[in-house]
Structure formats: structure tokens, C-alpha cells
Amino acid sequence: MSYVLKTAENSNDIKLSQLFRSKIFRKSKNICDNDELDQRCIHYLIFDKFNSYKLVCVFRVYLIHNTNQLCNSYSNKFYKLNNLKKIQDPMLELGRFCVDPNYRDPKIIMTAWSAIRKLVEKNKIKFLFGCSSFIGTSIDRYLDCFKFLKTKYIAPKKYNLYVKAPKVFKFNNLINLNNFCLKKAKKNLPPLLSFYLNLGGWVSDHVVIDNDLET
């Protein structure tokens, strides 16, 4: 397969991205998934060149150069970003990343990452962050994943994000940390999160339960 990446050039492109997000996140073609941050972001769309240029992936990036911009980030709605406010370098928030469930080609994420890398280099970005979603709100379903993350990938204290959302599950509540199935944990990790971890990323010490998106 071959993919073509496009940066949204107008409101129609952004609307197309929002409708795709709605289909993936909300399982609806009638609701437009949008928020106030959309107008501040750069939007990317990826198309399948050999399938009539079908839209298969969208995501958005938000460039952050000061504390006020950080406070306007999507992550700030759900996490206390006190530690990130101490970072003086330019940052980038990656968000609303979604892929057509019928496409499991790793080339899609690689295509996206190529664009992100160029943006990072151009803007001298030193820190990337964003939310990655587990499908559904069942904690039990992902206990192996959470134990795996707790044992290997919790962010250093200087980057830790504090609880802000009303409904969360804290990894400190996990018991028998060494009793989990590694194969199952890796299988159930969101592909995008796995990609971040392979690049050296970390996770917070809790997950947010979002009943709006059912994640």
C-alpha cells in the first residue's frame, strides 16, 4: 500500500478530519467531533493512494511556546500539567490521532511520524506529549497493560502529570505487579502508544476514564 499525507488547507479539510474522527471515536457519521482547539492546530490527513484516495488516518498537532498555550492544550483538560510548565523549550501536543480500524498497516504511523519529525525539526521542538486512548472504559480488560506500563514506563517525577479529571484509575492501586501476561499486555496496547514507547516515551501514573469518548 502507498499513502499520501496532506496538511489541511481550509475549513473543508478540517471538517473532513472532524467527520472522520467522529466516525472512529464516536461511531457516528452524524456528529462532528470538534472543539475550540481545532482552530489553533495543524491538521493532517492521510489517504490510501491505491484505494481511490480513501481517508484512513487523521491527527492534529498543537505548537506550544509559552504557559498560556500549554493551558489551552487538550491534555490540560484532564491532567494537571504543573511540571510541564517548568519546561522553557518549545513543545508539541499530538492529538486526535485515529486510524481506520480496517487498516493495520504500520506504514500509516510511519507516514505520520515522518511529518511530525519534520515539524519538530523546523520548530526546534524539545518535548512532545499527548493522550493515547484504550478502547472502552473497562479497567479489568487492560490490567495486564497497566501493570506492564507501571513496571517499565512511568515518567520521571519531574515530568509526572497530576490527577485532575474526576474519574481516574491510579496505577498505585495495582496489586501483584509482577503477575501479568506480557504477550497479552503488548497485544492490547494501543498501536500509537506502543510506537511512542519504542521511541523512548513515558506514561503518567494514572489513566483517565472518559465516558464521553468511552475510552
What residues fall within each predicted segment?
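Acyl-donor binding region in acyl/amide transferases
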Residues: 64-201, 207-215
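Active-site ExK catalytic segment of metal-dependent nucleases
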Residues: 58-64
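A structural microfeature
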Residues: 56-57, 205
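Short amphipathic alpha-helix that is part of the acyltransferase structural core
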Residues: 1-56
